[in-house]
């Protein structure tokens, strides 16, 4: 069996580094993050200089201390904004706890916490007997592939219990940048619809009360109708931010699939690389949506070779496809 050298995008290699080490495959990774980090460091002093200009008359030492504290508060606020549970009822964790206490015996009112031991749900069942859903097909495929649990994608149903996969869990599941952007767009649409729909629900309930007064004979039926129709409006759409694998599994059920690693002797791949220097000796390359800015040039040079195998991601879980290719080359 001849040894193969496989070219792939840097972020794909980085996400798969642990599995590659298990297979005793060498890694040649050209890291592009350092250069980007240098650019970010250069832009930060500009923001500080603007802050200094707006605080004339104050001491230099007190200004620097306040700026450091302000920077921490801003970061904390950004994190808090990302963590939310219920659309249309406030983005803080308190709203989630109130909703949970009113509607069901749940113990995971705190967002992002380790709610694995709470009565958050059995299998993929959420509050009020509903089922947890996700916002994109890619996330649903990744969860099914990793944990063996089939989960539905949200289809504009109300009420609904939606899982928002947050950054740390996105990396764990191998969600692509496009998949992350799609989830963000759907969240924005949901917030917009929920905000516009609140007034419409209030008007609808007011009109129903007027009709109930006009039809005195049907008063009892009107009361029953009002109760049943107001319940889903009160429940609405719940969004649960999930950062940990433990919490996700407590919500949807299932266990992580442990695949036996394939050793170097069983795999034909000797080296994986994103370096343009390895194009000359590469025997195959794998392309996928990537944040590696240098990959486009590497792939272009690789495609010019006559005797090289080209593989492309089908749009599923990129990490899973990459490792599957390595195991079957």
Curated annotation (Swiss-Prot):
Keywords: ATP-binding, Capsid protein, Hydrolase, Inner capsid protein, Nucleotide-binding, Virion
Pfam families recorded: Orbi_VP6
Enzyme Commission (EC) number: 3.6.4.13
Enzyme kind, highest EC tier: hydrolase
InterPro entries from the UniProt entry: Orbi_VP6
Binding site for ATP: 110
Region annotation (Disordered) ranges: 27-130, 189-232
Annotated localization: Virion
Protein name: Helicase VP6-A
Taxonomic placement: Viruses, Riboviria, Orthornavirae, Duplornaviricota, Resentoviricetes
Cellular-component GO terms for this entry: viral inner capsid
UniProt main location, coarse: virion
Name of encoding gene: Segment-9
Family, per entry: Belongs to the reoviruses VP6 family.
Function recorded in the entry: ATP dependent RNA helicase essential for RNA packaging and viral transcription. Possesses ss- and dsRNA-binding capacity.
Annotated Basic and acidic residues bias: 36-58, 65-83, 96-109, 189-207, 215-232
Ranges of compositional bias, category Gly residues: 110-129
Species the sequence originates in: Bluetongue virus 13 (isolate 13B89Z)
Subunit structure: Homohexamer.
Hydrolase found in the keyword field: yes
GO molecular function: ATP binding; hydrolase activity; structural molecule activity
């Amino acid at each position: 069996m001849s040894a193969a050298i496989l070219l792939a995008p840097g972020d794909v290699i980085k996400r798969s580094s642990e599995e590659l080490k298990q297979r005793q495959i060498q890694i040649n990774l050209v890291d592009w993050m350092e250069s980007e980090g240098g650019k970010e460091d250069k832009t930060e002093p500009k923001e500080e200089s603007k802050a200094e200009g707006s605080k004339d008359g104050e001491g230099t030492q007190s200004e620097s201390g306040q700026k450091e504290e302000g920077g921490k508060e801003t970061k904390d606020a950004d994190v808090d904004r990302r963590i939310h549970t219920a659309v249309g009822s406030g983005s803080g964790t308190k709203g989630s706890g109130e909703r949970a206490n009113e509607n069901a015996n749940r113990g995971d009112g705190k967002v992002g916490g380790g709610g694995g031991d709470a009565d958050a749900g059995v299998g993929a069942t959420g509050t009020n007997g509903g089922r947890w859903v996700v916002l994109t097909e890619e996330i649903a495929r990744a969860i099914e592939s990793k944990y063996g649990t089939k989960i539905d994608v949200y289809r504009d149903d109300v009420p609904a219990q939606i899982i928002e996969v947050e950054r740390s869990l996105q990396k764990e599941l191998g969600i692509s940048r496009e998949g992350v952007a799609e989830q963000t767009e759907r969240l924005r649409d949901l917030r917009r619809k929920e905000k516009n729909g609140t007034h419409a629900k209030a008007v609808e309930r007011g009109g129903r009360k007027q009709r109930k007064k006009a039809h005195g004979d049907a008063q009892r039926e009107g009361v029953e109708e009002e109760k049943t129709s107001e319940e889903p409006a009160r429940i609405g759409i719940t969004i649960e931010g999930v950062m940990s694998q433990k919490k996700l599994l407590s919500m949807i059920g299932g266990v992580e699939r442990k695949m036996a690693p394939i050793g170097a002797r069983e795999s034909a791949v000797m080296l994986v690389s994103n370096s343009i220097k390895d194009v000359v000796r590469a025997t195959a390359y794998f392309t996928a949506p990537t944040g590696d800015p240098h990959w486009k040039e590497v792939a272009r040079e690789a495609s010019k070779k006559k005797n090289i195998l080209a593989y492309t991601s089908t749009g599923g879980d990129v990490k899973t496809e990459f490792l599957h290719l390595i195991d079957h080359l």
